Amino acid sequence: MKISLIAVGTRMPAWVQDGYQEYAKRLPKELTPELVELPLAVRSKSTNTQNAIASEGDNMLKHIGSNTRTIALDVLGKSFSTEVLSQKLADWQMDGRNVNILIGGPDGLDSRCLAQADEKWSLSALTLPHPLVRVLLIEQLYRAWTILQNHPYHK
């Protein structure tokens, strides 16, 4: 099973890349995540935000394969505990399909991406800096895996 984090935004600060890589390398080979970075659409005072979101959505939809489980991160999504995430991870492994996790740009995900998602998750009711979401998400996936392995990291 492959987990793809499909994220809008490139050229992240070094701390984001370092944090992401630290947790990604800790995951076992069968769960090694793939980070797909998509360019952020140009935004200015004269551009329409909805057009930028739609452009990012077009790009994101091209990376969603058939017969995959797709999860969209959205402020209106469902929130849950790390323990519940660990059970979801176990279920994904049993299911065998690849998993896509969609991380939108600063203005969120295109409605077509949300419509294609099997699940919508909210990481927090707080507004999080866009780059931090990648690090937070990969850490939580690692933590969920450690729970399944009875590894002391979670304790």
Swiss-Prot record:
One of its GO terms (molecular function) is rRNA (pseudouridine-N3-)-methyltransferase activity. The keyword Methyltransferase applies. Pfam families: SPOUT_MTase. S-adenosyl-L-methionine binds at residues 73, 104, 123-128. It is found in: Cytoplasm. The keyword rRNA processing applies. It catalyses: pseudouridine(1915) in 23S rRNA + S-adenosyl-L-methionine = N(3)-methylpseudouridine(1915) in 23S rRNA + S-adenosyl-L-homocysteine + H(+). InterPro entries: Alpha/beta_knot_MTases (IPR029028), RlmH-like (IPR003742), tRNA_m1G_MTases_N (IPR029026). Its EC number is 2.1.1.177. Its main location: cytoplasm. Specifically methylates the pseudouridine at position 1915 (m3Psi1915) in 23S rRNA. Homodimer. HAMAP family: 23SrRNA_methyltr_H. This is Ribosomal RNA large subunit methyltransferase H. It comes from Saccharophagus degradans (strain 2-40 / ATCC 43961 / DSM 17024). The lineage of its organism: Bacteria, Pseudomonadati, Pseudomonadota, Gammaproteobacteria, Cellvibrionales. The gene is rlmH.
